[in-house]
Amino acid sequence: MIQQEEIRKLEEEKKQLEGEIIDFYKMKAASEALQTQLSTDTKKDKHPDPYEFLLLRKIKHPGFNEELSPC
């Protein structure tokens, strides 16, 4: 009887720990996805096109007579 009770407690503890492991991996995956997204956004902003704002506002490039066209 005592041995069966100990086995039952250990099985419950095992289930709880397995659930915590699953939750940990879910949080880890979400964190990695967010980190990847932020890293990608940072790389895009690292070397922005200096004339992109001109395209967005339809402003002519100084020194040129025509509007800039998207590359």
Swiss-Prot record:
GO biological process terms held by the UniProt record: mRNA stabilization; positive regulation of mRNA binding
Result, substituting residue 19 to A: Abolishes binding to IGF2BP1 and does not increase binding of IGF2BP1 to m6A-containing RNAs or to RNA stabilizers ELAVL1/HUR, MATR3 or PABPC1
Distribution of this protein across tissues and organs: Detected in colon (at protein level).
The organism's place on the tree of life at top rank: Eukaryota
Assembly and binders: Interacts with IGF2BP1 (via KH3 and KH4 domains); the interaction results in increased binding of IGF2BP1 to N6-methyladenosine (m6A)-containing mRNAs.
Task performed by this protein: Enhances binding of IGF2BP1 to N6-methyladenosine (m6A)-containing mRNAs, thereby contributing to increased mRNA stability. Also increases the interaction of IGF2BP1 with RNA stabilizers ELAVL1/HUR, MATR3 and PABPC1, and increases the interaction of RNA stabilizers ELAVL1/HUR, MATR3 and PABPC1 with m6A-containing mRNAs. Contributes to MYC stability by enhancing binding of IGF2BP1 to m6A-containing MYC mRNAs and increasing recruitment of RNA stabilizing proteins to m6A-containing MYC mRNAs.
Extra remark: Promotes colon cancer cell growth, colony formation, migration and invasion through enhanced stability of MYC. Expressed in colorectal, breast, ovarian and nasopharyngeal cancer cells. Higher levels are found in colon cancer cells than in adjacent nontumor tissue.
The protein, known as: Putative RNA-binding regulatory peptide
Source organism (scientific name): Homo sapiens (Human)
Name of the gene encoding the protein in the UniProt record: SEPTIN14P20
